[in-house]
């Protein structure tokens, strides 16, 4: 079939001779401009094909020319270009049309189409214009997007209530039929009841003469009328305006069209001259012309329909409570005339065993739900209220205060309920429905009203409010004649069914487009339940989806709902006939010699027997069981459920003992959780009675026979209670989903997880498709679709979150204290399920374990363990799921009490992202005797075994605070168990990282005295003494003077302005004045004590600095402590200033962010080997000739590097020798050398030589290796290459150094895009792997050519370096800010910048100082007045500096001057900041003395300091200030163990 044959209009038509071509001129209306409108393009092609098919064309070229004449720009321009490229004689007409279609076709925008539909309504457009526009828009819909029934439902939502109700009663089967019925209904209404229309709310009928305005419709075009926001531009008309349909099948062909009527001034109704429509006599004689014409036959539109009239219920919300009986069960009922439908609680439905049927989703909010919620289940209820029998349908809710709520539709249908329950004043007779019957005699229709069978003639002067029709199908099914009514004048068409829409079907604010439209949507289902309309009770914002309700199926895409509605349901259908086709069947193998059960039924009560019979009958109906003649029999028992119903269980214990076990391991829950990774959206599925969906092996069915008091039955499906049933089911589910990595299956619980909604729909489709193929049914109400958080196997799983369920934690928290071993075991069993959330769980639970093992009595220790476990679980951190692409760090620890570990996820900067899991284990008695090294290794091995499913085969970091691993690996003959551990350890890929530990003997941090400057320890405040300060305080004195308690004041001149301001406020403002009061001679502001100015610092010192009341917290906490008790003006401002100038806070609190100083890179190198940088790589294992260090020298221009093997004993003289031999002799003398402050570079010999050679030596600031970033980056690459090359021969790493240097210099750099060799030499040296061509031939250049080539490379390289430097500055300086200091300023220095890390750093101050700035090096580096004993340089980068904020009034004491005063105040020494070994003096800081000042103590005076304080400050001084012994930086070390971990890593 050709492309043209697939387009409407492309079929075969009778051919005419080509001479007829002049008779087919170009049609201006048949044009295509090239808009991306698929509907218009298809119409254009169809019309063109239709016209051309009627002519005999000589060739394809003439057909192309004819089609081209109907194209306008830009389509015409495309056609010209296409024909010129292809050649008009070379292409076929089919190719031309196909090209046009592919170029301009655009798939329709479904959202835009639906938005356009929502703007249509019969009330605005009239029925004909509605039909025309709806059809035009609907034709743009993809053919398979929606079923015919869904299209009908969508269309009927646009009709007025009158038309809507009548159309759905006729059950149209196609959209065309629905539109036809709507047109006929509207036409009939106009002819029956001229001059009447509904008012705005549709509740009453008012008389009005309709004047039809002569208005025209604009031709509807998708691009012109579908705007970006989806609104449709239309011409406004009266809601009763209906343009005649000239081509309607019930209209005569000779009838003039509407345009002709307008042109010739004809009546729209009778088509005659001389009058208008509202004056037409023929139209007024409506009762004499009731039959509508039809082409085929004359059919009356409405047969005899009884018309029922109800007395209007007052428009008020009447409510009443009443207890009614349903099936002898008392039900608490609310009669509410304000509710638009009826509801019933789920527990009553289950108790009364009502049959539940599905409905489209109903969204509601109000009395029955505080938030928007959705339900899609309903039941039919038969009620009897006094002598009134009622049948109603009610939606099912999970939670509601009342068990049943009967709403307005039922109360309007049965007014007698109002008289009985709500006590209305109408008499019972007046509340009886009045029935009107219509009869047609001699083509004249008359109406009669019937009351108790006595008809009387009446004159009908208004439109009927209710139409009532008998449903014969319902009557046949239920044995009675159920009446279905249709309301035309009420807001809710409740007479058809209470489960209907509340909003106006014709309203433009309809919300149907916000909900998925089900495939099975229909106007009226066969059982009489109208359930196709998506119902709302209150309007909901678009896309406002509430996921709190259990029914989330409606949130899925439409195509998923349509595809899988049959398998996602709340009821379990009968056993399908092809269930035996399932590849898995359950069999029962009996042990040899075992006897099958032959047991009698248990005794049951009559009530229980009835329950058993009901359940058995339901199983029989579903074909799950059949009557049996088996020789076996097992008894049954009834197990009560939480909702009061029962579950039938078969006692298969005897059968299970005789069955051969078939164990199949269930998946580990922690393994399942580890697969979630970075999932963002989740769905949980629960199979509906999963066991009952697997058939029994026919030969083994008789073994499942069970006996009840009324008979014997056997299962055709797998029953619950069989010993091997879980294995069969688990094996079946594992085989079904084994290859899907996005699915976790645990028996009948299924979790689907994805990283995006689009991916999730595909995953969900895959899983549901397999379930559908296996005939497995999913229980809808237990599923949760497409949510960001869900519950699975007792865990709450969300985005980057795994947490225990709160109600499970609450159950553990409320668990009573165990008194017996059994209770203790039960408690630990609950704890063990969540032990992954509890750090050191085994250690905490050890006292309970001792009690269970009868090694201890229950004491206070066990009580504390219980409380600790409960607190740890309830306050447990939220774990993050394992992500195979992330970086992980495992930290282990071991002690005599047990071993523990924590697995953490870290980012690329080694910062913590979250905890993945905890592990802990108690030690056995023998393990407690292991040496410390083996015990630490045991902890590592156990932790690796526990997290093996995550870490094996993945690189990670292993942290431990013990060097056991290295020492044990170096043993010649380790113990056998250690050897096994080391072999096991070798199967993992990890980097070993040792936690920093103490290397010097220091005092215990806990026993150390405070060594920083702190204000005097505050004493409790004596508020009585404040009275003496009132006179000098401006506020207090003003208040006392106003209260006549004070006549004179002592306010200082500085405070006089504030004093006068307070006086003025007290005189003029009542609000200000009433806040102050005097009690016991103390001034209060409201209920807070007013603090004088001179006592404000004392209050802040107490609540900020005091060891009991303070704690040096921040502004918020300190304000919260002070403000409820004390008051003074600008209280918050005072607290902010006080804390900002607190010395202790400045020293101990981390400064965030520490991004001071803008990035200032080194100047760009001018040429090759003019500017070089160098550094050392240390920590290498010694080689056979004792080489254990590498000198790295890098040309900052070409990035070429030399790696020179040497020894750590290298001194300055030997360093100079290496530079001459390997650098200067090959490349000449550089202008600058950049390095760190290594002792070899700071040596006098090195400095003297570089000075004589004219080399400028630039060094980094203290502890800031980023200054020499070039060397640091090169060393990182060198370390990686060493691990790759020397992994199998670590003792001879120096052998591989030349190869590593060649590989490094041959590799292009990211900055320059070329290799260092190419930049330096002008060519890439030849290698065996490549042929020598291109730039390699540069070696054969002439001298002039080579010079030109190198010069070009130099210019290009400088430009690239400058560009890279600008980009680096731009990227790094975005989050930085400059810190500008002046000479003489005091600053605090971060401990990481200058001082050595030691033990107990958590209790050490973060900043030290203050120190004075003595010289500015540049904007990023300053020289400080550091102590003269310090050998390190005094230049510090601003990254580690913080301005010291000075508070003069915080230091009330002066420093001691005389020796006697120093000795007397020796106990006030708080810190040692320097030692002058020449003069044997000690520089100290003292309490309450300005910290910028130091006190010099002689050696004899220093010995007078209390011993405890002296030892403490000396220990702190050694730890923070002394020079490090090892000049090498630890981060450059490549340890033996690190190299071993990279045996499989390529460079």
From Swiss-Prot:
Keyword terms of this UniProt record: Acetylation, Aspartyl protease, ATP-binding, Cytoplasm, DNA integration, DNA recombination, DNA-binding, DNA-directed DNA polymerase, Endonuclease, Hydrolase, Magnesium, Metal-binding, Multifunctional enzyme, Nuclease, Nucleotide-binding, Nucleotidyltransferase, Nucleus, Protease, RNA-binding, RNA-directed DNA polymerase, Transferase, Transposable element, Viral release from host cell, Virion maturation, Zinc, Zinc-finger
Keyword check for Nucleotide-binding: yes
Protein name, entry field: Transposon Ty3-G Gag-Pol polyprotein
Modified residues (N-acetylserine): 2
GO terms under biological process: DNA integration; DNA recombination; proteolysis; viral translational frameshifting
Note: Retrotransposons are mobile genetic entities that are able to replicate via an RNA intermediate and a reverse transcription step. In contrast to retroviruses, retrotransposons are non-infectious, lack an envelope and remain intracellular. Ty3 retrotransposons belong to the gypsy-like elements (metaviridae).
EC number, as in UniProt: 3.4.23.-, 2.7.7.49, 2.7.7.7, 3.1.26.4
A Pfam family per the record: rve
Positions of Mg(2+) 2 binding: 893, 936, 961
UniProt superkingdom: Eukaryota
Positions that bind Mg(2+) 1: 686, 748-749
């Amino acid at each position: 079939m050709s492309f043209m044959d697939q387009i409407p209009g492309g079929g075969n038509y009778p051919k005419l001779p080509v001479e007829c071509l002049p008779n087919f001129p170009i049609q201006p209306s048949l044009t295509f401009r090239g808009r991306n409108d698929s509907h218009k393009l298809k119409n254009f092609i169809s019309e063109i094909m239709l016209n051309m098919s009627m002519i005999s064309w000589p060739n394809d070229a003439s057909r192309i020319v004819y089609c081209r004449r109907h194209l306008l720009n830009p389509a015409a321009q495309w056609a010209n270009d296409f024909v010129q490229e292809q050649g008009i004689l070379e292409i076929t007409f089919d190719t031309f049309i196909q090209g046009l279609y592919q170029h301009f076709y655009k798939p329709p925008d479904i959202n835009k189409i639906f938005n356009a539909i929502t703007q249509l309504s019969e009330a605005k457009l009239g029925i004909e214009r509605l039909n025309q526009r709806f059809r035009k828009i609907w034709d743009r819909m993809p053919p398979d997007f929606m079923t015919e029934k869904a299209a009908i439902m969508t269309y009927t939502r646009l009709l007025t209530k009158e038309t809507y109700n009548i159309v759905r009663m006729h059950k149209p089967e196609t959209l065309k039929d629905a539109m036809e019925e709507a047109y006929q209904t509207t036409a009939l209404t106009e002819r029956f009841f001229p001059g009447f229309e509904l008012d705005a709310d549709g509740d009453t009928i008012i008389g009005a003469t309709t004047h039809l305005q002569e208005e025209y419709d604009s031709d509807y075009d998708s691009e012109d009328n579908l705007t970006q926001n989806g609104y449709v531009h239309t011409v406004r008309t009266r809601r009763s305006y209906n343009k005649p349909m000239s081509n309607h099948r019930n209209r005569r062909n000779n009838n003039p069209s509407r345009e002709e009527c307008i042109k010739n001034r004809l009546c729209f109704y009778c088509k005659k001259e001389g009058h208008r429509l509202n004056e037409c006599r023929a139209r007024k004689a409506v009762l004499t012309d009731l039959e509508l014409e039809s082409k085929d036959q004359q059919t009356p539109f409405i047969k005899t329909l009884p018309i029922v009239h109800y007395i209007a219920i007052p428009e008020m919300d009447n409510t009443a409570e009443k207890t009614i009986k349903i099936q002898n069960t008392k039900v608490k009922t609310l009669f509410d005339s304000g509710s638009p439908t009826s509801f019933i609680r789920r527990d009553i439905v289950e108790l009364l065993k009502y049959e539940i049927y599905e409905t489209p989703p109903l969204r509601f909010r109000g009395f029955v739900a505080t938030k928007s919620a959705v339900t899609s289940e309903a039941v039919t209820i038969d009620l009897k209220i006094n002598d009134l029998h009622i049948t109603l349908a009610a939606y099912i809710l999970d939670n509601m205060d009342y068990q049943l709520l009967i709403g307005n539709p039922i109360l309007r249908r049965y007014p007698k309920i109002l008289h009985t329950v709500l006590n209305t004043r109408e008499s019972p007779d007046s509340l009886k429905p009045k029935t009107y019957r219509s009869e047609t005699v001699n083509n004249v229709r008359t109406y009669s009203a019937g009351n108790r069978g006595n008809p009387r003639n009446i004159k009908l002067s208004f439109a009927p409010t209710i139409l009532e029709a008998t449903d014969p199908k319902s009557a046949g099914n239920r044995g009675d004649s159920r009446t279905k009514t249709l309301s035309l004048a009420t807001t809710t068409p409740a007479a058809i069914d209470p489960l209907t829409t509340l909003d106006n079907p014709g309203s433009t604010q309809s919300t149907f487009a916000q909900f998925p439209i089900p495939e099975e949507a229909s106007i009226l289902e066969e059982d009489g339940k109208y359930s196709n309309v998506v119902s709302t009770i209150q309007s909901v914002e678009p896309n406002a989806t509430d996921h709190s309700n259990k029914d989330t199926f409606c949130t899925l895409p439409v195509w998923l709902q349509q595809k899988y509605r049959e398998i996602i349901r709340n009821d379990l259908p009968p056993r399908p006939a092809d269930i035996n086709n399932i590849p898995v069947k359950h069999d029962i193998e009996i042990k040899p010699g075992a006897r099958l059960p032959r047991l009698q039924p248990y005794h049951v009560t009559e009530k229980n027997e009835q329950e058993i019979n009901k359940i058995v009958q339901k199983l029989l109906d579903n074909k799950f069981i059949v009557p049996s003649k088996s020789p076996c029999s097992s008894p049954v028992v009834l197990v009560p459920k939480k909702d009061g119903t029962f579950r039938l269980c078969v006692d298969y214990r005897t059968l299970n003992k005789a069955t051969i076990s078939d164990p199949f391991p269930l998946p580990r829950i922690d393994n399942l959780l580890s697969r979630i990774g970075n999932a963002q959206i989740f769905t949980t599925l629960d199979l509906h009675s999963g066991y009952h969906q697997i058939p029994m092996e026919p030969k083994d069915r008789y073994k499942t026979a069970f006996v009840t008091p009324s008979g014997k039955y056997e299962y055709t499906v797998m029953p619950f209670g069989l010993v091997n049933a879980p294995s069969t089911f688990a094996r079946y589910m594992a085989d079904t989903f084994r290859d899907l990595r996005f699915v976790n299956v645990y028996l009948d619980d299924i979790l689907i997880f994805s990283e995006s909604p689009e991916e999730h729909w595909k995953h969900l489709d895959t899983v549901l498709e397999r379930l559908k193929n296996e005939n497995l049914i999913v229980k809808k109400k237990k599923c949760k679709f497409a949510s960001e958080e869900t519950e699975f196997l007792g865990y709450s799983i969300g985005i980057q979150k795994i947490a225990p369920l709160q109600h499970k934690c609450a159950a553990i928290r409320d668990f009573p204290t165990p008194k017996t071993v059994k209770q203790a075991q039960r408690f630990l069993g609950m704890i063990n399920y969540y032990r992954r959330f509890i750090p050191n769980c085994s250690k905490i639970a050890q006292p309970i374990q001792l009690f269970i093992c009868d090694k201890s009595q229950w004491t206070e220790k066990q009580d504390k363990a219980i409380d600790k476990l409960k607190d740890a679980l309830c306050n447990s951190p939220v774990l993050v799921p394992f992500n195979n692409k992330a970086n992980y760090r495992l930290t282990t620890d071991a002690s005599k009490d047990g071993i523990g570990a924590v697995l953490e996820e870290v980012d690329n900067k080694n910062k913590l992202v979250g905890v993945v899991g905890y592990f802990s284990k108690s030690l056995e008695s023998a393990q407690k005797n292991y040496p410390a090294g083996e015990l630490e290794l045991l902890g590592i091995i156990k932790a690796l075994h526990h997290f093996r499913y995550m870490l094996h085969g993945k690189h990670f970091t292993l942290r431990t605070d013990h060097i056991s691993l290295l020492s044990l690996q170096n043993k010649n003959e380790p113990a056998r168990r250690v050897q096994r551990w080391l072999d096991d350890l070798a199967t993992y890929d990890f980097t070993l990282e040792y936690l920093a530990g103490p290397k010097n003997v220091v005092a215990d941090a806990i026993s150390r005295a405070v060594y920083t400057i702190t204000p005097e320890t505050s004493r409790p405040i004596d508020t009585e003494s404040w009275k003496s300060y009132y006179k000098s305080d401006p506020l207090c004195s003003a208040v006392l003077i106003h209260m006549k308690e004070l006549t004179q004041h002592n306010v200082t001149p500085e405070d006089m302005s504030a004093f006068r301001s307070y006086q003025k406020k007290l005189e003029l403002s009542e609000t200000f004045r009433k806040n102050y009061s005097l009690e016991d001679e103390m001034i209060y502001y409201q209920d807070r004590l007013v603090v004088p100015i001179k006592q404000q610092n004392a209050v802040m010192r107490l609540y900020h600095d005091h060891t009991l009341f303070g704690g040096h917290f921040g502004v918020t906490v300190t304000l919260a402590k002070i403000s409820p008790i004390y008051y003074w003006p600008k209280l918050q401002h005072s607290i902010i200033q006080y804390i900002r100038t607190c010395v202790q806070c400045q020293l101990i609190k981390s400064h965030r962010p520490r991004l001071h100083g803008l990035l200032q890179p080194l100047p760009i190198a001018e040429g090759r080997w003019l500017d070089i940088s160098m550094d050392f790589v240390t920590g290498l294992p010694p080689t056979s000739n004792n080489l254990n260090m590498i000198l790295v020298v890098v040309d900052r221009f070409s990035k070429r590097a030399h790696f020179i093997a040497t020894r750590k004993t290298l001194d300055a003289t030997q360093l100079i020798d290496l530079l001459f031999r390997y650098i200067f002799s090959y490349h000449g003398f550089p202008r600058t050398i950049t390095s760190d402050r290594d002792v070899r570079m700071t040596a006098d010999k090195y400095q003297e030589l570089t000075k004589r050679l004219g080399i400028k030596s630039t060094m980094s600031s203290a502890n800031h290796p980023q200054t020499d970033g070039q060397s640091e980056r090169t060393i990182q690459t060198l370390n990686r290459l060493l691990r790759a090359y020397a992994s199998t021969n670590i003792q001879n790493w120096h052998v591989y150094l030349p190869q590593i240097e060649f590989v490094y210099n041959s590799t292009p750099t990211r900055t320059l895009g070329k290799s260092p060799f190419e930049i330096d030499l002008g060519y890439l040296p030849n290698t065996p792997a490549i042929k020598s061509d291109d730039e390699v031939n540069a070696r054969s250049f002439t001298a002039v050519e080579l010079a030109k080539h190198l010069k070009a490379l130099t210019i290009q390289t400088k430009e690239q370096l400058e560009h890279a430097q600008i980009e680096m500055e731009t990227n790094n300086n975005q989050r930085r800010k400059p810190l500008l200091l002046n000479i003489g300023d005091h600053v605090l220095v971060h401990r990481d910048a200058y001082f050595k890390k030691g033990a107990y750093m958590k209790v050490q101050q973060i900043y030290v100082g203050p120190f004075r700035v003595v010289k500015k090096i540049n904007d990023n580096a300053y020289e400080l007045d550091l102590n003269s004993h310090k050998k390190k340089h005094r230049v510090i980068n601003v990254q580690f500096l913080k301005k010291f904020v000075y508070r003069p009034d915080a230091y009330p004491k002066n420093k001691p001057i005389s020796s006697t005063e120093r000795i007397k105040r020796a106990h006030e020494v708080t810190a040692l900041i320097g030692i002058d070994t020449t003069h044997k003096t000690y520089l100290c800081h003292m309490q309450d003395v300005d910290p910028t000042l130091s006190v010099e103590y002689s050696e004899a005076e220093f010995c007078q300091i209390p011993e405890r304080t002296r030892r403490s400050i000396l220990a702190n001084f050694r730890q923070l200030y002394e020079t490090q012994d090892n000049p090498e930086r630890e981060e450059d070390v490549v340890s033996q163990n690190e190299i071993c971990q990279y045996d499989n890593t390529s460079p």
